From Swiss-Prot:
Binding site for ATP: T9, F10, H14, P15, G16, H17, D97, Y124
Xref: HAMAP family: FAD_synth_arch
Family statement drawn from the similarity comment of this UniProt entry: Belongs to the archaeal FAD synthase family.
Catalytic reactions on record: FMN + ATP + H(+) = FAD + diphosphate
GO process annotations (BP): FAD biosynthetic process; FMN metabolic process
The protein's name in its UniProt record: FAD synthase
Pathway info: Cofactor biosynthesis; FAD biosynthesis; FAD from FMN: step 1/1
Domain of life: Archaea
Function, as annotated: Catalyzes the transfer of the AMP portion of ATP to flavin mononucleotide (FMN) to produce flavin adenine dinucleotide (FAD) coenzyme.
Binding partners and assembly: Homodimer.
Co-factor(s): a divalent metal cation
Organism per entry: Methanobrevibacter smithii (strain ATCC 35061 / DSM 861 / OCM 144 / PS)
Amino acid sequence: MKKVMATGTFDLLHPGHGIYLNEAKKLGGEDAKLYVVIARDSTVEKRKRYPIVGEQQRLELIKMIKGVDEAYLGNENGDFLKIVEEINPDIIAIGADQRHDITKLQKAINKRGLKAKVERVKAYHNAELDSSCKIIKKIKKMDFKGKINDNCD
């Protein structure tokens, strides 16, 4: 059984997230276990923007996805390799649209004496709303014409 680790923000879930996680698990073969690490709010703020959905809710949502065996919040101190040491995966799956330098990451993993092999997932869901950013932009542009429920807090 191979352990596959996938990472991400997973803010405003969309089909691209599901495809990434399914393809990540396939990298480990038929009996693979998928471990998903969700970026902390503080990490997301530093790298992208303030998350819409908080880290605890994002963790709960990922745990509900079929095919995810275990899910964890990442480390707040910025040491990504600490969670890699804890999970000790055989494969770290990088999403098709994630901006990671695979060679640099593999060198850092090797330097720490870890066995994980870094692989990029090739499949990508190309659609109108295939990123959280696109979803946010669409919502900002929409004119709801007063049709938002007033009971919404």
